[in-house]
């Protein structure tokens, strides 16, 4: 079965061939069939190819490996394997509280009406900065982390709702008066500057120990 990426390349190739036909033989547009070919070459096929390509990019840009393909993100990828439950990203990643293949996207998209589009636009900006600009060092979020992203998954979960601590401050959490990540509760995040002093979880080694037993 032809994948989206292959289909996009095929459509681009078809568009180029049709455009060459029109350029080499402009007289072809004098006929009705020629006008149809020109319309396909200049409008329909490019639009469809762009749509397929954009859709494929949208899907690929959600992948964890896409985010970590930028060298400046490498330590953030390593932090997902820190063997310490207080590291919030690591605890979520290692315990499958978030999809492993969409770990970055799951926590860093905006769960609002146009959140996905906003996240994609930021992703395109990251690609632009990576290739043509100068990434900030250290990197940081554009805006303070919104509790909405945490509550999207945790609100309604028994482990969250049954916690007296959460119950008392739920209104302040929803209004962002108290931050989940910077108010002394869950504030150990990627902490990339401290990766040299921590232990790392090796899932392959863990599986080997289980097999040995």
Language model region names:
Residues 1-213:
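Short sequence/structural segments immediately N-terminal
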């Amino acid at each position: 079965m032809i994948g989206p990426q292959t289909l996009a390349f095929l459509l681009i190739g078809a568009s180029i061939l049709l455009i060459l036909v029109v350029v080499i033989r402009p007289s072809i547009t004098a006929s009705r069939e020629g006008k149809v070919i020109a319309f396909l070459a200049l409008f329909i096929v490019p639009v469809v190819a762009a749509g397929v390509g954009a859709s494929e990019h949208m899907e690929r840009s959600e992948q964890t490996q896409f985010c970590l393909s930028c060298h400046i993100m490498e330590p953030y990828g390593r932090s997902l394997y820190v063997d310490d439950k207080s590291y919030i990203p690591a605890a979520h990643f290692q315990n499958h509280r978030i999809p492993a293949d969409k770990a970055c996207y799951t926590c860093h998209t905006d769960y609002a009406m146009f959140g996905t589009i906003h996240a994609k636009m930021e992703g395109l900006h990251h690609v632009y900065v990576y290739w043509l600009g100068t990434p900030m060092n250290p990197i940081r979020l554009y805006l303070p982390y919104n509790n909405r992203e945490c509550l999207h998954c945790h609100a309604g979960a028994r482990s969250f709702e049954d916690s007296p601590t959460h119950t008392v401050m739920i209104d302040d959490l929803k209004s962002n008066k108290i931050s989940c990540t910077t108010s002394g509760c869950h504030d150990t995040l990627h902490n990339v500057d401290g990766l040299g002093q921590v232990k790392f979880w090796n899932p392959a080694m863990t599986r080997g120990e289980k097999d040995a037993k």
